[in-house]
């Protein structure tokens, strides 16, 4: 049975690679992210907007694109145009990485709601990226691809930059409340307004937060303080 479960799990550990190219500036608003992904700019600049926050990514950065997030993006060419690579990861691969490295990523997950989605790409992560994309272009066995993908995620996590990418729509309600509040931290938020965004009743939201030993006002204060 254990071997069967491992085989099924391996078949779900999928990685996809794509390239975005443009000669002229592109602006895309309210782009939904369906699978967790990373974007590495090779030429030009990417402007990123999520909630009330903004960031600029160049060739020494990587953009984290968490599943379930809605982003505004602008791709700005330089003299040679705009080019970026995108790697997307199946939910099963993200879940396995979280399970294997919980001790390392737990703090990053707690801080993910206020972390930037544009982070530095250090030498270790850049090398892991290049190895993974080279393997995806060849007939590399799926088990090795999954290992290399987790190596890239680990390189980002060791740099303290993996939290937002690992957020799951099945995460605790408090984390999802934080994401809603980050849409506009200074707004006049109420339990009812946040519950509406999450398609819950206000009493249900309060009750489920209480089960997690969290309180709406405390979460709101944390978001506004940037904790």
PLM-predicted stretches and their roles:
Residues 1-5:
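Cyclic nucleotide-binding regulatory module and flanking cytosolic helices
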Residues 145-170, 197, 201-203, 207:
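Linker/hinge segments immediately adjacent to helix-turn-helix/homeobox DNA-binding domains
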Residues 11-110:
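N-terminal regulatory/effector-sensing and dimerization cores
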